[in-house]
């Protein structure tokens, strides 16, 4: 961090200039800034989130969803930058006023100099914002007919000041959008209510809001929006099973960066500095790059995120990672398999060369990609369409090679409807390059199909209890616990590679965990009598309905 010595030197050489600048400060701007520092009474509730969404959703009358999504998320991001700036500013002010702090000074001019020095912000991962880029400047000019241009200009200033972090991150679409100053006023005034306080850190508040809006846009857009968004319960489950700590994490289909967020949150829960985790991501969609970068910056993190096709232009070809995570496109077809060269290093499992996956389905190209990028002592966890568990032909040959090389250490069959508007059943795969001796030749299968909470007609989620139940089984397996304690009929089973081979190298958990039959203590004869009586009632009811329909048709002359 910068020190007072630097500023004492600056003060001696430039005191007159600083005095002139201080006179230019208006009481109005100071008051505006002060009002944005914090609101200790602020509380982020589901009701408040819903209010924000209703405000944003009114734009749907003027713009398509895929357009106004970026208008809204961009404004939330700009609001977050300002709040984080003022949050850090308040921290500096407290240090300057604290006699026990190294920054303590009673010199008002020196205090002003320090408050405007960007080193004191950047050292804590906070961007120093020029006045024209702060939210309060937007508020002051909110009724200006060129407010859209003011916002775009602010974005350009930030890009020029921080090209490595912000170049092409925030869409400059505000001047060209069909929204007028009244629309922007409506949004800006409502988003101004989002604040922070001692109990509500900026990155927590805005991280939650950003995630909430991503989820809501996914609901509205359906499958189109879903390609950017992996349900939070799934990203958390995978990150927890992998037990992500420090090191490197890579997502080659990063979408909006959900896996990175879950990893960062896990580190913070465990008291680990988030800077201990190096983040790498790739996606073929430029908008995914923007969403991920904004998602990370809001949370005070940075990442090496690149744009291109992971199949054919792997931007991290020479790198392996401690953790590989992903939710790739399911059953992607026409992916130009013919462009994969025979000597592609991804087409090798151990000492065995495997064929190129079929052009009609890229699932196994993704799996090979994940394995290739997993470090020798690393782990991978990813979402995959259920078809990959049992696919035959070339895919079956690749799966056999993966299993025989003892790379799979866990498979979880997921409950239905975890993805909004996507009914395709999915499973989670977990890969390890090097297993401990007690795990070698074994795979943990978990059937979690009935482990869910329904939150709407279209969507289910995994609760914290569900996630813990699954993670606990993996912890037992990885710690060498007795298999009799791990195995649970109908839910979990540690199977050997020999067992899997006897099942044709199929990885469907249901093949191994068995079926749990509940005994309610009622004798079979009693049950059959009840069922027979119920069936007779239903058949009688059917006959009555048939006669009723016939009467109606006769009356109508049919």
Swiss-Prot record:
- Give the Enzyme Commission number: 2.1.1.72
Annotated keywords:
DNA-binding, Methyltransferase, Plasmid, Restriction system, S-adenosyl-L-methionine, Transferase
- Which residue windows does the record flag with biased composition (Basic and acidic residues)? 8-18
One Pfam family for this entry, by name? N6_Mtase
User: What reaction is this protein's catalytic activity?
Assistant: a 2'-deoxyadenosine in DNA + S-adenosyl-L-methionine = an N(6)-methyl-2'-deoxyadenosine in DNA + S-adenosyl-L-homocysteine + H(+)
Q: Where is the composition biased (Basic residues)?
A: 19-28
Q: How does it assemble?
A: The type I restriction/modification system is composed of three polypeptides R, M and S.
Query: What is the protein name given in its UniProt record?
Result: Type I restriction enzyme MjaIX methylase subunit
């Amino acid at each position: 961090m910068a020190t007072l010595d630097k500023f004492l030197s600056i003060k001696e050489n430039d005191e007159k200039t600083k005095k002139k600048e201080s006179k230019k400060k208006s009481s109005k701007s100071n008051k505006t800034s002060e009002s944005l520092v914090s609101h200790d009474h602020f509380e982020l509730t589901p009701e408040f989130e819903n209010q924000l969404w209703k405000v944003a959703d009114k734009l749907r009358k003027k713009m398509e969803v895929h357009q106004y999504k970026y208008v809204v998320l961009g404004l939330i991001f700009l609001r977050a930058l300002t709040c984080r700036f003022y949050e850090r500013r308040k921290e500096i002010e407290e240090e300057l006023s604290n006699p026990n702090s190294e920054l303590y000074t009673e010199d008002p001019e020196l205090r002003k100099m320090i408050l405007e020095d960007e080193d004191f912000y950047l050292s804590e991962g906070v961007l120093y914002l020029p006045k024209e880029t702060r939210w309060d400047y937007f508020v002051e000019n909110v009724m200006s007919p060129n407010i859209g241009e003011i916002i775009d200009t602010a974005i350009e200033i930030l890009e020029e000041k921080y090209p490595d972090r912000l170049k092409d991150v925030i869409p400059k679409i505000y001047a060209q959008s069909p929204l007028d100053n009244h629309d922007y006023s409506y949004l800006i005034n409502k988003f101004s209510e989002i604040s922070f306080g001692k109990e509500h850190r900026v990155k927590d508040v805005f991280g939650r809001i950003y995630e909430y809006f991503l989820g809501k846009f996914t609901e509205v857009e359906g499958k189109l929006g879903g390609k950017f968004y992996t349900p939070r319960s799934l990203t958390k489950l995978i990150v927890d099973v992998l037990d992500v700590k420090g090191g490197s994490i890579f997502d080659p289909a990063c979408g909006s960066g959900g896996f990175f967020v879950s990893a960062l949150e896990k580190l913070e829960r465990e008291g680990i500095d988030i800077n201990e985790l190096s983040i790498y991501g790739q996606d073929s969609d430029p908008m995914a790059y923007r969403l991920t970068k904004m998602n990370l910056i809001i949370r005070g993190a940075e990442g090496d995120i690149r744009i291109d096709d992971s199949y054919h232009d792997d931007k991290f070809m020479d790198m392996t990672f401690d953790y590989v995570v992903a939710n790739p496109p399911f059953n992607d077809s026409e992916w130009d398999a013919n462009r994969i060269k025979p000597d592609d290093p991804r087409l090798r499992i151990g000492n065995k060369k495997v064929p190129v996956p079929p052009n009609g389905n890229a699932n196994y190209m993704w799996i090979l990609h994940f394995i290739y990028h997993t470090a020798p002592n690393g782990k991978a966890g990813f979402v995959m369409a259920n078809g990959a568990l049992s696919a035959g032909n070339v895919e079956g040959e690749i799966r056999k090679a993966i299993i025989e090389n003892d790379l799979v250490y866990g498979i979880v069959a997921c409950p239905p409807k975890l993805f909004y508007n996507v009914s395709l059943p999915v499973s989670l795969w977990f890969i390890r390059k090097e297993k401990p001796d007690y795990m070698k030749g074994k795979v943990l299968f978990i059937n979690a199909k009935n482990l869910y909470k329904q939150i709407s007609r279209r969507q289910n989620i995994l609760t914290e209890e569900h996630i813990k139940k699954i993670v606990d089984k993996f912890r037992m397996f990885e710690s060498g616990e007795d298999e009799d304690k791990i195995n649970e009929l109908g839910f979990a089973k540690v199977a050997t590679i020999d067992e899997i081979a006897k099942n044709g190298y199929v990885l469907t958990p249901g093949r191994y965990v068995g079926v749990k039959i509940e005994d309610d203590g009622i004798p079979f004869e009693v049950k059959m009598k009840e069922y027979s009586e119920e069936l007779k009632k239903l058949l009688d009811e059917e006959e009555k309905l048939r006669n009723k329909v016939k009467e109606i048709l006769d009356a109508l002359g049919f």
